């Protein structure tokens, strides 16, 4: 098969011909029809993810396609199924999985990180019966790949961890793919959304995707104070989807009393949290929670939003490109100035 491959962290990325994968006893092989490009893929290539331990390596973790082979122990998944899967695939048997929290599985499988990923014609996955998700018949593979880790992660962050309700004020700090996904989902469930970023282009897109207000943090003297003014008393829920000391502090300080902060963006290992928002945490009885991925059993709620017409994942897609573009696009991702998500299509146009 053809695959995108690199042999060292930060090294050259190229298309190569490698052996087709075979399924593990509990696994399956998926013929990839579409796969999304995510900043996590760039972090993996740069050596920021400890799960990548062996070379050569194939990146990619947001995909949709068709099951072409299954392991001997697989009972639910069938050859020919059109599927996607969470980027964190739970084993199904550890204590966390048994409690329904597959997204923090003790033995999680992550395509593109713990194993070769989906920037290839085929991808082998583990724990197939627990994690493969059948796609709605009217959902294209490109739309399903756009769900990826961004829309799925944002769905859990907004609805489960943030517990956003209709009429809530929700602030989203950082309007990359994850932040824009959070804007879309919060708006879809009836929240009043304030989007924050430092670039006008993603802020304009956030408004088109449902944000009621947008704030350019570079042009705002006090972002948290501006959110308090717009919402009258502060956000009910605020999400840091970027991951920096500044966005963390702004998110916490923008909350009303007894509000909820959801940390979704990853902070660097060198980041030190400022004391001001942590002191506010006590005085105002604020909640701070993390959010990581989405369990397989929670996907029907996400699909319901899409099928109802309240959420359209294709609105998040900025570019659709052939897989051959992936080496250049992955290496250039840190300088990408567009808005939205790039999806690589492996299906020839008809």
Language-model features, listed with the residues they occupy:
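Glycine-rich beta-strand-centered segment in the early N-terminal region that forms part
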Residues: 19-35, 48-95, 136-139
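Short, surface-exposed secondary-structure boundary micro-motifs
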Residues: 33-35, 72, 88, 102, ...
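Mid-domain Rossmann-like dinucleotide-binding core that forms the NAD(H)/NADP(H) cofactor-binding site
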Residues: 82, 139-219, 225
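Short glycine-centered segments of the SAM/dcSAM-binding site in methyltransferase folds
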Residues: 82, 169, 259-261, 287
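NAD(P)H dinucleotide-binding glycine-rich loop of Rossmann-like/cofactor-binding domains
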Residues: 91-173
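Glycine-rich cofactor phosphate-binding loops and adjacent beta1-alpha1 units
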Residues: 162, 204, 208-285, 349-350
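C-terminal hydrophobic helical "lid"/dimerization subdomain
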Residues: 249-253, 296-350
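Rossmann-fold dehydrogenase core element
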Residues: 260, 275-315
């Amino acid at each position: 098969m053809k695959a995108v491959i690199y042999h060292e962290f930060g090294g050259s990325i190229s298309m190569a011909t490698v052996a087709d994968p075979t399924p593990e006893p509990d696994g399956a092989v998926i013929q990839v029809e579409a796969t999304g490009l995510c900043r996590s893929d760039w972090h993996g290539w740069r050596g920021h993810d400890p799960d990548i331990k062996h070379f050569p390596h194939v990146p990619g973790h947001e995909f949709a396609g068709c099951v072409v082979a299954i392991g001997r122990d697989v009972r639910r998944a069938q050859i020919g199924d059109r599927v996607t899967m969470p980027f964190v695939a739970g084993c199904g048997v550890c204590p966390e999985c048994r409690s329904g929290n597959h997204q923090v599985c003790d033995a999680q499988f992550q395509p593109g990180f713990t194993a070769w990923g989906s920037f290839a014609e085929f991808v082998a996955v583990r724990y197939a019966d627990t994690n493969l998700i059948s796609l709605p018949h009217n959902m294209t593979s490109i739309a399903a790949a756009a769900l990826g880790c961004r829309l799925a992660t944002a769905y859990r962050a907004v609805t489960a961890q943030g517990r956003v309700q209709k009429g809530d004020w929700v602030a989203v700090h950082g309007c990359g793919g994850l932040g824009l996904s959070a804007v879309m989902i919060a708006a879809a469930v009836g929240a009043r959304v304030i989007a924050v970023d430092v670039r006008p282009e993603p802020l304009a897109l956030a408004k088109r995707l449902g944000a009621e207000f947008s704030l350019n943090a570079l042009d705002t003297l006090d972002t948290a104070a501006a959110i308090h003014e717009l919402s009258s008393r502060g956000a009910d829920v605020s999400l840091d989807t970027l991951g920096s000391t500044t966005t963390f502090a702004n998110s916490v300080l923008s909350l009303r009393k007894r509000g909820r902060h959801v940390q979704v963006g990853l902070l660097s290992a060198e980041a030190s949290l400022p004391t001001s928002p942590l002191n506010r945490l006590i005085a105002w009885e604020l909640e701070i929670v993390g959010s990581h991925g989405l369990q397989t059993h929670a996907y029907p709620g996400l699909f319901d939003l899409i099928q109802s017409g309240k959420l359209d994942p294709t609105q998040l897609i900025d570019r659709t490109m052939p897989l051959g573009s992936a080496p250049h696009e992955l290496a250039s991702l840190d300088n990408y100035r567009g808005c939205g998500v790039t999806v690589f299509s492996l299906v020839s146009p008809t």
